[in-house]
């Protein structure tokens, strides 16, 4: 995987916010054969629950949520064609394997910088589960949004390789 092109590819895709409550509802839709709020195949999910937008902005503070909370749902969505996930923190081995198996990628966004991140999201539209408030599913457009390729489709894992590189032996 060319890590530089992976990030630029996200800017060409639809990016959807989805956290715990939305993932639970999406899973129920799949299990019940109900329509999904968006096409999973080829999509990117940003684990975030943005705040209300201030005047002149498309979105409020929009920092990443801890991704491991979605690990129970991620392999299923990756097997349905999800191409990218964006969040913070490590992923389970089951998710890492599903990323490899499906040719997907996991990006980390900068935690604690949600107020700055909103400046890189010029478009935001609530598309599903409006009753969930900040956890509703939103369609976003990223523009120069800072991302780090953290787990790639060939087994690269920055969390593991970083520890190996800096771990003292002996």
Question: Can you describe what each PLM-predicted range is?
Answer:
Residues 1-7, 11:
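Single conserved hydrophobic/aromatic residue that forms the stacking wall/gate
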Residues 9, 14-18, 153:
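Short, charged beta-turn/beta-strand-edge "cap" motif at the junction between a beta-strand
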Residues 9-11, 46-47, 149:
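Short hydrophobic-aromatic micro-motifs
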Residues 17-145:
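Feature captures the catalytic cores and cofactor-binding loops of soluble hydro-lyases/lyases
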Residues 73-74, 150-170:
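Active-site/ligand-binding-proximal alpha/beta "capping" segment
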